[in-house]
Amino acid sequence: MKKEIELKFFVDDLDPVRRNLKKMKARFEGSFRESDYFFDTPQNTLKKRKAVLRLRIGDSRHFLTYKENIEKGRFKVSDEYETSFENPKVLLKIFERLGFRVWFHYAKSPREYWRCRNSLITLDSFPFGKFIEIEGGPRRIKFIARKLNLDFSR
């Protein structure tokens, strides 16, 4: 289990963020297509416990993630358990057979992964907007966000 701390920002344009990441000597780790499937029971057991069960299916890698104790304030903080797996179709079938249902699904056009100062920065583009997510310690997140000229009020 790890403690995940993250902050998301809405932006109008990803290009200035990319330029600033390069100026900061951030390391580009790649761009991957991903589809996220969120599961719960018909009784919304996980939602009631403030927990999330997510299957992330990517181009070349797949992850099963369980998050609980999700606190939403300035930073989103949660206990996160994550593991990789090989066969998404089988895992989807297992969840279905266990009585879980997909309550939300979305696909990300290539998600960009960057590393800087022991933090993970992801850039996402959806039909409804562009987002930056920074994961790390609160002070690091704030520092990186300022260097990227991200607006804390959005």
Language model regions located:
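Mixed-charge, glycine-accented linear interaction segment located at domain edges/termini
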Residues: R139-R154
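A contiguous pocket-lining binding segment that forms or flanks enzyme active sites
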Residues: L123-P127
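Catalytic DNA-binding helix-loop module of base-excision-repair DNA glycosylases/AP lyases
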Residues: K130
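N-terminal strand-loop-strand beta-hairpin
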Residues: M1-S119, L150-R154
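Short amphipathic alpha-helical "recognition" segments used for binding
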Residues: F10, G137-R139
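C-terminal accessory/tail domains of diverse enzymes
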Residues: L46, I121, R140-F143
